[in-house]
Amino acid sequence: MTELKKDVARIMQVVKGEGVKERVFSAKSSYYNWSKEERELKARVENIRERKLMTLIFDLEESLQRVPSQSEYLNEYMKIAFAKIKKEDWYTEIVKAFNQDFIKSCVTWRADRAYKSSLIEIMTAMQLESKGYTVFRHKYLDMVMGVDLVAVKDAKVWYIHITKDSTFSKDKVLEKGTYRDYWVNYKRFNYQRNFENHVELFYSADEGTNNVVKNGLPLFKFDYVMDALDEQHAFKYDDNNQM
């Protein structure tokens, strides 16, 4: 059994068991009910950039030799996020005393969203492989290129972004397209991302045109994925983009 098939089997165990949660939907209040201070704190949590958060799903897969459970993922995500938050100027003693629980909720919501997207990426990779594509999924594709999956077939390549079908999430993808540098061993490497003609796959928490939902996990419909990987979004697979 390939590693991808093992990952898919593990995800199916999660889906059949406790399922996949996105706890923002069960929050006692929503964005429209929050105070100005809470909205600002939510934005600050969302704007935290930490490499260890970006690679967490891959790092846990490597250390555990399997896809982590959602609780395992959240526990590690919370540790890393708060290690970063505690260094921020805005995390004052007053904020800590009066807004700690709200900040934890914001981190949880962000972690839930990231975990769900990671599982969808794995399941989509399996869908594509079943249709004869060679699929690449790696932390450096995401960190450097801002791409979730790369699919190759018949000397053509597609660069795939997978995100939630919401204005907030779509804006995050556009923001990723503006990144211009990356640090390795304290050395800065400059580059320019270009998402033009990339494939964008959008999922919803509810069943619809693009996906079904199995115990909290959206799964893309085959036709939606296949239609998206068309000639218009294909690049020639040559020496310039082989990995």
Label each PLM-derived region with a short phrase.
Residues 103-122, 142:
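A short, highly charged nucleic-acid-interacting micro-segment common to nuclease
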Residues 121-144, 148, 152:
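A short acidic/basic microdomain associated with nuclease active sites
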Residues 1-90:
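Nuclease-adjacent, charged terminal/linker segments that flank catalytic cores
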Residues 100:
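Rossmann-like adenosine-cofactor binding region
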Residues 162-230:
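Catalytic cores of nucleic-acid endonucleases
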Residues 2-19, 212-243:
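Long, compositionally biased intrinsically disordered regions
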Residues 151-160:
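Active-site beta-strand-loop-beta-strand hairpin of nuclease catalytic cores
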